[in-house]
């Protein structure tokens, strides 16, 4: 299997693990600090405290639009968990891209370097 395919598969596996962990530990309702405010402003598409977080509010509204009012908090929290999982995925790919650029010799990467690069991506993400 070539490095590119292995990198993609490993990245999506890391994403799946992160998604499982985030969704299984997610609050079903609100928790402390600003979470309640963000859930409310995302559900009603209102202005939160400065500086706001317009992209978060729009995504939260998109997720909560498909839920009943009782489940709006769970949907906004699941959107936050999925967003965090995608950030883990892109962090993994960023680390492996940098590792690949550092380890490449003559345009080729050997098996040991591939394992080290993917391992560093998993640990770093």
Language-model features, listed with the residues they occupy:
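Membrane-water interface at transmembrane helix exits
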Residues: 26, 60, 64, 92-100
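Extracytoplasmic catalytic/substrate-binding loops of multi-pass membrane glycan-assembly enzymes
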Residues: 26-38, 48-60, 71
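Transmembrane signal-anchor helices characteristic of membrane glycosylation enzymes that use polyprenol
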Residues: 5-32
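Membrane-water interface of alpha-helical transmembrane segments
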Residues: 1-11, 77-80, 114
């Amino acid at each position: 299997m070539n490095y590119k395919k292995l990198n993609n598969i490993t990245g999506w596996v890391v994403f799946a693990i992160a998604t499982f962990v985030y969704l299984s530990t997610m609050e079903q309702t609100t928790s402390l600090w600003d979470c309640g405010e963000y859930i409310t402003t995302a559900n009603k598409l209102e202005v939160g405290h400065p500086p706001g977080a317009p992209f978060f509010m729009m995504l939260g509204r998109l997720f909560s639009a498909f839920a009943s009012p009782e489940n709006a908090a769970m949907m906004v929290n699941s959107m936050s968990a999925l967003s965090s999982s995608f950030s883990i995925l892109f962090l993994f790919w960023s680390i492996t891209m940098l590792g690949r650029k550092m380890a490449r010799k003559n345009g080729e990467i050997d098996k040991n370097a591939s394992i080290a690069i993917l391992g560093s991506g998993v640990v770093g993400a």
